[in-house]
Amino acid sequence: MAREPLKSSEQLFAVLSNASDARPPLVAPSPIWADTIYAEWDAVMPFAGIVAADSEFLDWVASTESRDWGRLAVSSASLEVVVEHFRSLTQVLMPGGTAVFFRFWDGRFLLPILQSDEVQSAQLIPVISRGLINGQAVDIGGRAQVSGRVFPWWKVPESVLASAGNAVR
């Protein structure tokens, strides 16, 4: 974020895992699976919240060694739209058509997918322009202000599975 400060139209979001032992210190995040059949799954619920540019949370992000806590994302969309889009990624379709849960908040899984030549990041996450995943700045390129998708809609390319091995299974 230091290399490319937020524009006046942008907000910084944290996308968090409730299952991480790291326990990121973010106040009042929105549960992503609210209003789904998984709304009661508190122990593994992913969350999203707005992070102030001067938040102490960013110091925690810079110093944590944890790789499963979540990630940072920049968007011009509202918190509600960001949550709605990540909710649409609750499940994805494997090459054989089976719907599986997608750990979109976990950089260990998401980063190799976004780095794949077979995945157009701005189509997968159209409401996010850029982010920070496991200490790496990532350009997503999304500019959308709405999502409107319902899971499962994204099909994991076979080549992503082949190149990542068991890392994304």
Language-model segment annotations:
Residues 1-103, 107-169:
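Terminal low-complexity "docking" segments
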